[in-house]
Each structure stands twice: as C-alpha cells, then as structure tokens.
Design a protein with these regions (language model features):
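Conserved GTP-binding G-domain of TRAFAC-class P-loop NTPases and closely related GTPase folds
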Residues: 225-226, 232-253, 258-263, 267-314, ...
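Conserved glycine(s) of the Walker
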Residues: 377-378
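Conserved nucleotide-sensing/catalytic segment adjacent to the nucleotide-binding pocket
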Residues: 389-446
C-alpha cells in the first residue's frame, strides 16, 4: 500500500477518468520507487571545505545600450519621429541610382537645407566606415540577419564620435560599401515577362538596412550624413565618388574649405597582414590576428589626401600593424621623358613632343599581333605608336567576333594596308590563325607582348571605365573572371610560332601629367 501511495504522488499527469491501477502500473511504480528511494549523498561534515563554492555571476560586457533595448520594446506609436532623411543619387544622368544617402538632424537642429548651407563650415572631416568600424552584428555572425542585429563595435564609439562633433569641431561622416544591396530591380531580359531578375530577398535588404542605419544615427544623435555605395561604380571605395558627393552636399568646393591635414578616415580595410602577437610568458601559443580583406579604406584616404587609421588605432589606441598593397602606386610614379633632361620635361607639352620610340616598322606591309591581358595598354599603344605609322586596327571588342576580325584583317591586307590585331591572343592555338593568314597573304607577322601585371591591368580597366576622358570607346569595366581566364590560358609567345620577332613591352605609365592625375589614384 505504501508503494501505491508513492505511485499516486509521482503520476501527476492529468487524466480524463479515474482508473484502477493495473499490473503495468505497478511495474512502472516499482521502477519509479526504486529511483525515488535510492541512496542519497552523505551530508557534508562540518568544517569540510573541500566542496567548491558556487561560481560568482559576472555581468557580461556589452556594447548594446539601454536605450536600444528600451527602443526595441517601445510600441511604434510611442516612438519618436525618425530624424533620418533618405535620398538616392546616380553617378551620371544616364545611370540608375546606386548611392544611398541618409542625413540625420537631431531634434531642435535646423532643417536639412539650413544645416547644409550654414555659413559656419566645419573644415575638419572625421569620416568612418560602418561595418566592423562603428558597429558589428550583435549575433556574432559576419553579416546582420535583420535590422535589429547590431551593436556598437566598442562601447566607447558613440561617445568618441559625439566628442568629435560637440567638442573638437569635426563634421562626422560615414562612408560604407554595401554591394549586397540593390536599390532597384533589374529589368527582365525577356520582353514577355514582367518579373524582375533581382530576387525579392535581395530587394528586402534595403528597408532592413535603412531601419538599422536610422537606429544607429538616432542613438548617436549628432548631425551627420551616411553614404552607402551599392554599385561597382565611382562611388565604391576606394574611388572618390562618395567624398565628392559629401563635398557638394556641404558646399566644400574650394581648396581651403577642408582642413585635409587634420581630417581623417577610419576603417577596417587597411591591408593589414596576419600577425602572431607575443606569447603570454611563452607558455600559451598566440592566435594570429586575421588578415584584412582589402586595403580600400586606406586607399580612399590616400586618394582624397587625409590621414588614415584603423578602428583599433583610433578607438583603442593600439599600435599600427604592418600592411601591404597588392597594387602600390609608389612603384609607378609619373615618369620624366627618357629622351631629354629638359627641366620642363615633365610637362604635358614636353612629354607629348618627345615621345618614347617603342616600335618601328620594318617592312612595307606587316601584320602585328598584340598579346596581353585586358587592360594591359594595348589599344593605347596602338593609338600612340602604330596608328601614326599607318597601321589599321582590328579589335574584337568593336567587331564582336573572331570571324569578323579575320575577315576585316584579310580585306585590309588585300588592299595593301598593314594591320594590328588588338586582341588578347593568349595561347598558340589562337595566334596560329593569324600566323597562317599572314603567310597566305605573303606578309611578315610580328608580335608585341605586353608584360603588364594582372593587378595593374585591373587598375587600368577601372580607370578607363570610370573616366570618360580616358575612355574614347566608352568601354565598361570587366569582371575579374576576364583577367583570371586570360591568365589560365596564357602561353608565352615564341618566335618559333612563326613570328618575325617578338617585342616585349614592360608597363610604365605613358601619358600626360593631367592623365596621371586621374591614373595615379587607387581605383580597385
């Protein structure tokens, strides 16, 4: 009976009707009784201090402010008005908008127009990247999964920015690349379909991003502007487009309107290399600090002529780490003319008059085959060195197919003209068709090999695509795949392929000083 009583106490699950216990119930109750009535631990003897005390609960440090938590639980009807104004901008009149601009004006401040056009201009700019510089994800993931998934990168960030604005006279600006955002759906390639090519999930990221940025700016609560580049155009860091828009928005047009010496850009993309910090007493193996994903933030600061620091240097006072650039402009300075020691040889007029001779015609009629990756400088070389010698040009970017190139070259040769094949021609199989054409037409075939490093080619391609004065054929920028594809197929050209000679051209900037002002910035 005692065991039955215990069973009733254990089996507290609700039932719809009262049933008498069955043998099955007694079997279960016996099992349960064995567990309940098992041996217990002996009581600790008095004075026994071998038992550890319970662990102390420590309050975890967090960068999430109390106001953020309060705002999250506040009903929408009771939340203050959003002080952030959003606009969109295009790189030119013929392109869609790719730049998101958020202007925040605290309550009680002048209106947007008045704050921008104020007669008292702040000459010092403190510009910051957004992700991994001012904020990071609260979830610990690489990318925020929703608008609320963020926290300050370090708890000192908001107070430091407020001090810059309120006490040190800086204008605080935010520049961020947001390539994962699409402002407007791409039109469908099919005329019969009205559905956009851009996935809906990608379009949904824009309102989430706006909501997150509005919360960040609201907590910061100082007059500021955030610029978010969503395309691979002039706005994307390290390109200067966002900086130029900021200058226009704040009426900073004159050379002395900005104190460049005391202005600064802070961002995590500094080209830092992975390093092993010193071990702790030599006993614990140190963990390597990760390598930066790019050098775009450091390069933007270089392009606009201001100081650069990483978040660790600016907010935490850490010492700078070593950094490298895949493409370093230091290796490609503006050259003086190699044919003269005239003090004015660096001027555009002098360099154009005394052009370096890199190619000479050796026969009345020739077929010249260019070999080199996209952006190696092949077309520029033609215009400056071979066109003046009377060569006609065949280019697949213009004619759109190899067959059309072969047909055009054949017609030029039949008319007695010399021809340049201005294509990449990476491998012997591709070059063989042109060697056979030259033999068939009875003209010598020569090769000019452009030994331009791939990273310089990518730089040249970006310079050409983003600057109309240097893009007479209005070419668009190429994907990285185009450069990697050439590299995978490339075989060094040899005289034994049938060439009369192979002229090697190493890259160095050849152009006017005005052109170098554009070329001599970081574009990738």
């Amino acid at each position: 009976m005692g065991q039955l009583t215990i069973t009733r106490r254990v089996c507290l699950c609700p039932t719809t009707s009262l049933r008498l216990p069955t043998p099955h119930h007694f079997a279960r109750s016996f099992s349960i009784t064995q567990k309940v009535m098992g041996p217990t631990k002996r009581p600790a003897e008095e004075g026994d201090r071998s038992i550890s005390p319970p662990p102390l609960k420590r309050k975890a440090q967090t960068a999430i402010s109390k106001s953020a938590v309060a705002s999250f639980f506040t009903p929408v009807s009771q939340k203050p008005k959003d002080r952030t104004t959003w606009t969109e901008k295009s790189p030119d009149a013929d392109s869609p908008a790719t730049l998101l601009v958020a202007k925040y004006v605290p309550e009680g401040s002048p209106t947007n127009d008045e704050s921008v056009n104020t007669t008292v201009k702040r000459r010092k700019i403190a510009a910051f990247d957004l992700d991994s510089t001012l904020i990071t994800s609260a979830s610990g993931k690489k990318h925020s999964h929703d608008a609320a998934d963020w926290k300050w990168w370090h708890h000192s960030v908001p107070d430091r920015l407020r001090k810059l604005y309120n006490e040190e006279g800086y204008q605080v600006i935010i520049f961020t690349n947001q390539g994962g955002l699409t402002l407007h759906a791409s039109p469908s390639s099919s005329s019969s379909s009205s559905k956009p090519k851009t996935p809906k999930a990608q379009l949904d990221r824009v309102p989430q991003f706006k909501q997150k940025c509005s919360a960040v700016l609201s907590q910061l609560d100082i007059p500021t502007t955030l610029y978010a580049a969503t395309g691979k155009d002039i706005y994307r860091k390290p390109r200067p487009g966002m900086w130029l828009e900021m200058k226009a928005d704040y009426n900073l047009f004159n050379d002395d309107d900005i104190d460049l010496e005391n202005s600064i850009f802070v961002g995590d993309a500094g080209g830092r290399q992975s390093e092993l910090p010193p071990n702790s007493n030599g006993r614990i193996k140190a963990t390597a600090t990760p390598k930066d994903f790019s050098c775009s933030d450091r390069n933007l600061a270089h392009n606009v002529g201001i100081q650069y620091q990483t978040p660790e240097e600016f907010f935490l006072g850490e010492e700078p780490r070593n950094f490298t650039r895949d493409f370093d402009l230091v290796k490609y300075p503006y050259p003086s003319s190699p044919t003269t020691t005239d003090p004015d040889s660096s001027s555009s007029s002098s360099s154009s008059k005394k052009e370096e001779i890199l190619f000479t015609k050796t026969s009345p009629q020739e077929l010249v085959l260019f070999v080199g990756p996209p952006g190696a400088g092949k077309s520029t070389f033609y215009w400056r060195h071979l066109k003046p010698l009377g060569f006609e040009r065949v280019n697949q970017d213009v004619l759109k197919s190899k067959d059309k190139c072969l047909k055009a070259a054949t017609e030029y040769l039949k008319e007695g003209d010399s021809v340049v094949v201005d294509n990449t021609n990476p491998d012997p199989d591709t070059r063989k068709q042109w060697v056979e054409l030259a033999k068939k037409q009875g003209v010598p075939v020569r090769c000019v090999w452009f030994r331009t490093p791939l990273v310089v080619c990518e730089h040249n391609d970006a310079v050409r695509a983003l600057n109309k004065p240097l893009n007479p054929e209005s070419r668009t920028s190429l994907p990285k795949l185009a450069f990697n594809s050439f590299n995978s197929r490339f075989k060094e050209p040899k005289v034994k392929e049938g060439f009369q000679d192979v002229t090697e051209v190493d890259f160095k900037f050849r152009g006017t000083k005005e052109e170098y002002e554009i070329w001599g910035k970081y574009w990738i």
